[in-house]
Amino acid sequence: MNKIIIFGFPHCGTTILKSIIGHIDEVQEIIHECSYIEQKITKKFAVCKTPFTRGHFFSSSSWSDYHKIFIIRNPFYVFSSLNKRHSFNIDKEHSIENYNETMKMFHYFKYICKIPNTYLIRYEDIFDNDYQELKNIL
């Protein structure tokens, strides 16, 4: 079985990306947010998602057999969405500082450590050219 985990930062598009991949016939979509696939898988692929990026996704052997898809989105739209959802009262976990740290962490593991099976997609590019960016990853 091939496992796929989608992560990024809240309101970057993890849910919609998981749904798009989950609609592929050979993919079993894990409905609830999780950072590890534990349930029985009946299809060739399984996809899960979590809105937050954690360093152990890259450094722990528990995720070494996962295809890791990191999704980013223009921070203007991320924080417009977060402000709307939280009535302009964003907590520390959803702060611009955490957004920046998330971007730095991904850059470190993808480009400095060169962790295999790690991919980057921009939310703004998902739908272009009949999902071409996503097809390039999968």
Protein language model annotation of sequence segments:
Residues 1-50:
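PAPS-dependent sulfotransferase catalytic core
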Residues 51-138:
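PAPS-dependent sulfotransferase catalytic domain
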